[in-house]
From Swiss-Prot:
One of its GO terms (molecular function) is pyridoxal phosphate binding. The gene is glyA. This is Serine hydroxymethyltransferase. It is found in: Cytoplasm. CDD domains: SHMT. (6S)-5,6,7,8-tetrahydrofolate binds at residues 121, 125-127, 246, 355-357. It comes from Streptococcus pneumoniae serotype 19F (strain G54). Homodimer. Catalyzes the reversible interconversion of serine and glycine with tetrahydrofolate (THF) serving as the one-carbon carrier. This reaction serves as the major source of one-carbon groups required for the biosynthesis of purines, thymidylate, methionine, and other important biomolecules. Also exhibits THF-independent aldolase activity toward beta-hydroxyamino acids, producing glycine and aldehydes, via a retro-aldol mechanism.
Length: 418
């Protein structure tokens, strides 16, 4: 809008070429990282807008700087749209990330040193749910709950028993690698039974919740956090929701001046655009297709005895696959697939025996390929290509066949139409 592509290329060819290479990579790769997606041109336009110039510490109507009338309109649009999407009374759209949203939620609910229960990383939790290397594990006394070792599903009886023993002040629900439906009402029952608050991190499933395809945590959680990317298809950022006015005040204070200064007004604008897209009926169709494509890929793996899907299948946008019968570990699988232009990540599985740098599994997500237009047929083909690659890792002729098949798919489904 202000600085066009030709100007950019002429001014900084090195940076322009790097960005162009990334655009080429995204166009020519099949993206299966579950936390990634493809945003609209409108989202990118908003994020690259002149709003990046404006500082606006505070909140709409209560800023510390002048000249904020326009950014007040922008932020209010984002807030009201977020509230409408999720049926929440209060929304804070300023968090720069999901991790910062979680940090602010903790600050609003508990004190340093308090006992908290969160899902352990290998069972599908997130670093900010109490991992020792995270601020969460270093600030609070986290006690991890796990999935059932046999079913690899959440065991609410076991979680209740554990909660009765450790008496947490807060229970954190939500996951970054759990492929089944989460019953948030049961988590609230457990929290109430032990006098704890409930916080839900729905970062991965927020788009499915928004589309009505996964139960919403908002009626049950004291605070709900999410990212605005992943299945929501917005810019990288965070969002906090609550129905409690007093908690809303604490959340606002925790974000600013607690852990952030001025909001990124251009990112808030991009969030507002993406929220408008979520409110469009077409988004529900997109989210439904994400689940269909995830199931289609999982079904291919379920038919091959050399692979094992954690928990036996998927009901959302992702699933985990134990690859150790075919290759040494998840890291090896990730690297092999990189060579044929299929991008995903190694991932720990429940009761993991390998280090987080190797892992027994890989995580596969359908959000980005669905955004490109892949359907169930293409998704099954992708799963077949993954299996073909991992089972023929030493056969360059087969790997070249896979590369050609990947190129056919990416050429047929462009990242962006010109």
């Amino acid at each position: 809008m202000i600085f066009d592509k030709d100007d950019f290329k002429a001014y900084d060819a090195d940076l322009w070429n790097a960005i162009a290479k990334e655009e080429e990579r995204q166009q020519n790769n099949i993206e299966l990282i579950a936390s990634e997606n493809v945003v609209s041109k409108a989202v990118m336009a908003a994020q690259g807008s002149i709003l990046t110039n404006k500082y606006a510490e505070g909140y709409p109507g209560r800023r510390y700087y002048g000249g904020t009338d326009v950014v007040d309109v922008v932020e209010t649009l984002a807030i009201e749209r977020a509230k409408e999407i999720f049926g929440a009374k209060f929304a804070n759209v300023q968090p720069h990330s999901g991790s910062q949203a979680n940090c602010a939620a903790y600050m609003s609910l508990i004190e340093p040193g308090d006992t908290v229960m969160g899902m352990d990383l290998a069972s599908g939790g997130h670093l900010t749910h109490g991992a020792p290397v995270s601020f969460s594990g270093q600030t609070y006394n986290f006690v991890s709950y796990s999935v059932d070792p046999e079913t690899e599903l959440l065991d609410f009886d076991a979680i209740l028993k554990q909660a009765q023993e450790v008496k947490p002040k807060l229970i954190v629900a939500g996951a970054s690698a759990y492929s089944q439906i989460i019953d948030f009402s049961k988590f609230r029952e457990i929290a109430d039974a032990v006098g704890a608050k409930l916080m839900v991190d729905m970062a991965h499933i927020a788009g499915l919740v928004a589309a009505g395809l996964h139960p919403s945590p908002v009626p049950y959680a004291h605070i709900t956090t999410t990212t605005t990317h992943k299945t929501l298809r917005g810019p990288r950022g965070g969002l906090i929701l609550t129905n409690d006015e007093e908690l809303a005040k604490k959340i606002n204070s925790a974000i600013f001046p607690g852990i952030q200064g001025g909001p990124l007004x251009h990112v808030v604008a991009a969030k507002a655009v993406s929220f408008k897209e979520v409110l469009d009926p077409a988004f529900k169709e997109y989210a439904a297709n994400v689940i269909k494509n995830s199931k289609a890929m999982a079904d291919v793996f379920l038919q091959d005895p050399d692979f094992r899907i954690i928990s036996g299948g998927t009901e959302n946008h992702l699933f985990l696959v134990d690859v150790t019968k075919v290759v040494e570990n998840g890291k090896v699988a990730q690297n092999l697939l990189d060579e044929v232009n299929i991008t995903l990540n190694k991932n720990s599985i429940p009761y993991e025996s390998l280090s987080p740098f190797k892992t027994s599994g890989i995580r596969i997500g359908a959000a980005a390929i669905t955004a490109r237009g892949f359907g169930e047929e293409e998704s099954r083909k992708v799963a077949e290509l993954i299996i073909k690659t991992l089972k023929n890792s030493e056969n360059e002729a087969v790997l070249e066949e896979v590369r050609s098949a990947v190129k056919e798919l990416t050429d047929a489904f462009l990242l962006y139409e010109d």
